[in-house]
Amino acid sequence: MGKGVGRDKYEPAAVSEHGDKKKAKKERDMDELKKEVSMDDHKLSLDELHRKYGTDLNRGLTTARAAEILARDGPNALTPPPTTPEWVKFCRQLFGGFSMLLWIGAVLCFLAYGIQAATEEEPQNDNLYLGVVLSAVVIITGCFSYYQEAKSSKIMESFKNMVPQQALVIRNGEKMSINAEEVVVGDLVEVKGGDRIPADLRIISANGCKVDNSSLTGESEPQTRSPDFTNENPLETRNIAFFSTNCVEGTARGIVVYTGDRTVMGRIATLASGLEGGQTPIAAEIEHFIHIITGVAVFLGVSFFILSLILEYTWLEAVIFLIGIIVANVPEGLLATVTVCLTLTAKRMARKNCLVKNLEAVETLGSTSTICSDKTGTLTQNRMTVAHMWFDNQIHEADTTENQSGVSFDKTSATWLALSRIAGLCNRAVFQANQDNLPILKRAVAGDASESALLKCIEVCCGSVKEMRERYAKIVEIPFNSTNKYQLSIHKNANAGEPRHLLVMKGAPERILDRCSSILIHGKEQPLDEELKDAFQNAYLELGGLGERVLGFCHLMLPDEQFPEGFQFDTDDVNFPVDNLCFVGLISMIDPPRAAVPDAVGKCRSAGIKVIMVTGDHPITAKAIAKGVGIISEGNETVEDIAARLNIPVSQVNPRDARACVVHGSDLKDMTPEQLDDILKYHTEIVFARTSPQQKLIIVEGCQRQGAIVAVTGDGVNDSPALKKADIGVAMGIAGSDVSKQAADMILLDDNFASIVTGVEEGRLIFDNLKKSIAYTLTSNIPEITPFLIFIIANIPLPLGTVTILCIDLGTDMVPAISLAYEQAESDIMKRQPRNPQTDKLVNERLISMAYGQIGMIQALGGFFTYFVIMAENGFLPNHLLGIRVTWDDRWINDVEDSYGQQWTYEQRKIVEFTCHTAFFVSIVVVQWADLVICKTRRNSVFQQGMKNKILIFGLFEETALAAFLSYCPGMGVALRMYPLKPTWWFCAFPYSLLIFVYDEVRKLIIRRRPGGWVEKETYY
């Protein structure tokens, strides 16, 4: 058997080269896959096919030959995409991004403890505790995130059922049913209605065969398959049937030309699994944030390391300080906060039918600036529906709404009765059994999409079609074929006063009209004159221009003299009239838009998101749906529209004058990347029609070159490469193929485009709320670090210890920080432009300056005020504390004098110091009350926003209760070195808390009064 042209190109080569060679080869393979499908089998005659594959076109291959080929090519199955082992996924959660910062902190803590253990007789265990706690935080949060993602991938596992199981092949002249994996190139295969196509086939004979290619090309209409070579493009020609598409009716026989990964479907799957998904925007934001925090920590650490050497501390002490400052800068609780916030949003989205596969995708949808949407099933209902009829010389509109709440038309006309009778009788579609309790539009139908649409329409308008068919029993029929372009049947007519036989016919409108000499108007036959022919032509063009599929209908009462009862009608040697019939009307069908889509597209537009339609369907249909859902808005013209309006050739119109643009896949094939960039840049409303899977990918890459964050929706296998390449891929849960669900980051459980808009809203909200959570969490870093810094510089007893810092970060601050995730939007977040990933960061300099430089400093003052009050009440006035550290911390000195000359032992001094730690901790809780309330909003006043967030109010009480518990619970002095406080000491920080609230309210007032002013530029994060 000859080895087929173009075959070598797709052989998955053995991976032998290393390093760069391997990478270059991968890139070359990807470029190869992005090219259009190249095959020439559809152009070959049957003799050439026989020579190329060595197959007997009647007897098939011999069993021995088939076994040889199977050994050479391997099984006819898609290579499963390389899956990430579970332990790698787990490690990613443990060591990715933010976790790394905490691990470094933990290692530094153990290092500091090691240094202390080696140099001191009785080292303090603080650093050891801190190291252990940091490690525990990372491990627990890592397990939590891993569990979240594993849960989503479990749902994914349940989707696997893509590949056909059995195939009917002819070998040694006998038909045999074999496992589809054993089909080989050159096999002679038979398929019938209801089968999945087992491999790429070159059809050699067919009988009324139609296939559903929607999972591959996106066309909702079944495509005819026959042995004829009808198009240069292998995806468009009629004599190739593709692996894993469905045969919906008829039978066909074909020769296998490609199997497994070499099939068109296989190439798409390989293309999808070979694409690298980029970093998600939120991951980039967290990385940016880590850089900032690390920068601040290292800067402070090194500055004070040098300062402590200048102040004549020893090297080892200076290193301990350095480590202490760096660790104090790490916000221990933030990793858990971010994870919990994203999880809460993911749960909220799941309730609204968006299943998110990885947590980071939650926010990506919020920063989306371009959505490339598939048409069939996403924007539309994925069911052909009767949209218009033309009879009695006027166009009537049918009801296309999902719940039949739309307009109706006049059903009393005698012509409509005749038209509905033809549509019901000349129709092979039937409702499947046992569905009487379902609404008509929801019932499953056996038959092609157009006939199902007619069946449902007639059932809704005129009652039971089954009864109609019983009343007019079918005698003979000629099924639709591509040469005649019509379908005809003859029925018994039981109506009194009418001839006994009724001939009904439907088909391509122009072919039907050619066979008619009269037309039915208001139930009366009239001769078909030029005027009526023009009226027909205008109606046909108008309906076709709406992107609808139009069928013509005619009938003839067969005279009883020529066709008495029992007449033998012969369909092979036609013995009845098929000309001079009576034209009755036109019916047009379309896959109508979903009800919620126009509103969703409008919301996207006001949110600054560009919606681009990318479909495999015809440009006219695509444009009609785009106009119907608002992707091309009212009054916006394409180049063709302008040319038609000005009555000039298209070539004379300047493309930049047109806001809207419909691009045909064949034009896209010849475009340079620069030309595509031009289209994406200068047109606001774009439709790509007749695109191939590879082109979808090129469009997504083009949008990303413009700096857009791209979301792609799709349900077919053909969408999977684009889904994988996009910043966020959105697959359909009901109609989606498994390959597309595997490639996507998010799944719409109800297949509705409107759910994406909900997702965008949730994504934007979580971004805003994460900012607030981070601002809240970071603020307490300053009152945690400054005591340590003053301890080094001013040589005073340590005002706040390590253990108390942990109680704040992992205790009192956690619930309030998470409660901000429940905060409602301040303004209509769907009215603003998408954020610019380059300039609008999650954590920017302004947020750091607010948290560290302004609010944090006021908090630190509150803490120090409490510290000095308690020290003074115990006899140590502020001026006496300066420089006392060395003697204070010396366990052998038991006679340190205070300002009044009283002597203090080491134990007594330490109890006062730990009481100060507790009081400083409580002061931070008190000032964090105000911080939590001001973090609710970034621009509005808290009085405008209100205190509707119940979780936040719970958080305020929870942190206060926790602080009181840690302070007053017996035994805390031993466990955490925390001692009970006098009630008056709680109030020391109150004025500072009030100051924070007033300061921030005034700042926000100025921002609202002077938008774009100095205060907004410097402090609005």
Curated annotation (Swiss-Prot):
Upper taxonomic lineage: Eukaryota, Metazoa, Chordata, Craniata, Vertebrata
Region (Disordered): 1-36
A Gene Ontology molecular function term of the record: metal ion binding
Membrane topology: Multi-pass membrane protein
The EC number(s) this enzyme carries: 7.2.2.13
Family: Belongs to the cation transport ATPase (P-type) (TC 3.A.3) family. Type IIC subfamily.
Protein name: Sodium/potassium-transporting ATPase subunit alpha-1
Composition skew (Basic and acidic residues), residue ranges: 1-11, 26-36
Organism whose genome encodes this protein: Ovis aries (Sheep)
